[in-house]
Amino acid sequence: MNAWEVNFDGLVGLTHHYAGLSFGNEASTCHRFQVSNPRQAAKQGLLKMKALADAGFPQAVIPPHERPFIPVLRQLGFSGSDEQVLEKVARQAPHWLSSVSSASPMWVANAATIAPSADTLDGKVHLTVANLNNKFHRSLEAHVTESLLKAIFNDKEKFSVHSALPQVALLGDEGAANHNRLGGHYGEPGMQLFVYGREEGNDTRPSRYPARQTREASEAVARLNQVNPQQVIFAQQNPDVIDQGVFHNDVIAVSNRQVLFCHQQAFARQSQLLANLRARVNGFMAIEVPATQVSVSDAVSTYLFNSQLLSRDDGSMMLVLPQECREHAGVWGYLNELLAADNPISELKVFDLRESMANGGGPACLRLRVVLTEEERRAVNPAVMMNDTLFNALNDWVDRYYRDRLTAADLADPQLLRGGREALDILSQLLNLGSVYPFQREGGGNG
């Protein structure tokens, strides 16, 4: 059956700021306390979405979350009106204010793990929300992510959206950023590659930075998504590269159809994994980048592998890269060699995503891949699909509500909270989502 990969990109939120909240993510840490530009960040993301849609790649948008998220501050013991809560936390514990104001939901590669209908036992598209429990600020996302996905994939005959796994370390799940699918045409059954960093009873794990994904979580997600057991491979990421800042597998590898583009040191027991994939995926091709040409450090700093590998109708592929790759002589030299070599990659497309990159999120972080048949695509909430009208409406919305300068101190401004809620209220109407945000259901959360 014919099917297409639709990229659902996260729209950057109004409180996008640099707080260094993500230990193990070196870009996040080294840009801590810099001044951010939320308006520019949102527009950079929108330009990528529109350019890819115009190039013929189906594209949709996932909206930001409510931030600052007052209900969690109340759970932490801050009381009074919303304004009083903001004032108290800013004065007594500003780190909590930064955490509950993070715009990290923009990186929707961590929103959920997807199983296309061609791979599932019941013939539905399955989406399991990620619990993201390794980082406090990201653990706050799951409930609203579930509401948003249910509003977008609202046809229960075709889509099953599963709640996140229990919030315990044993079941740490980071979503599609640790998941690849390999195979032929999108509508054919594919091989799902779940990548984990640690498992109970296995001493092979990183020592410097945390391994966020567990094998136990990956196995549970595969069960929830009803993936045919014959179409699943579990593989461990190389713990040494996690310790070098590869906090998700999509920082060191990306797949599309029959191609796996990865670093030579991406996986533990890599040669064994690639042999397994060759045996189980027709036409499988591994493009392994040697460490002698691109070091892990350079891969992390440029986000070479946090790229999008997209298929054209003629079978050729386009690699979507952040501008940092073009600015690094060694990486750009390798990429031009790659273009000249015998492989399906025939075009490089470069985007300026500096605002997201400075927090450790490249092109692949910003998108959630969902393979859909034509019938399934028609069943998706049409208001989220990118086109000229939506692009213009979202740009106008960003111009109206987003600031062009934001510091950690600005997060305590009650007007940022009020303006953000007004903006999301308008956006949820524009995207026909209904009442997906807690403030919409609870009358603003005062009291």
Swiss-Prot record:
Active site residues according to the UniProt entry: 174, 248, 365 (nucleophile)
Pathway annotation from the record: Amino-acid degradation; L-arginine degradation via AST pathway; L-glutamate and succinate from L-arginine: step 2/5
Pfam family, one: AstB
Residues the entry annotates as binding substrate: 19-28, 110, 137-138, 212, 250, 359
Enzyme type, top EC level: hydrolase
The organism's place on the tree of life at top rank: Bacteria
UniProt record, GO biological process: arginine catabolic process to glutamate; arginine catabolic process to succinate
Keywords recorded for this protein, A-Z: Arginine metabolism, Hydrolase
EC assignment: 3.5.3.23
InterPro entries on file: AstB_sf (IPR037031), SuccinylArg_d-Hdrlase_AstB (IPR007079)
GO molecular function terms noted in the UniProt entry: N-succinylarginine dihydrolase activity
Record's catalysed reaction(s): N(2)-succinyl-L-arginine + 2 H2O + 2 H(+) = N(2)-succinyl-L-ornithine + 2 NH4(+) + CO2
PANTHER family the record matches: N-SUCCINYLARGININE DIHYDROLASE
Subunit annotation: Homodimer.
Role noted for this protein: Catalyzes the hydrolysis of N(2)-succinylarginine into N(2)-succinylornithine, ammonia and CO(2).
Family stated for the protein in its record: Belongs to the succinylarginine dihydrolase family.
Cross-referenced NCBIfam families: arg_catab_astB, PRK13281.1
Protein name, entry field: N-succinylarginine dihydrolase
Organism: Escherichia coli O139:H28 (strain E24377A / ETEC)
Gene name of the record: astB
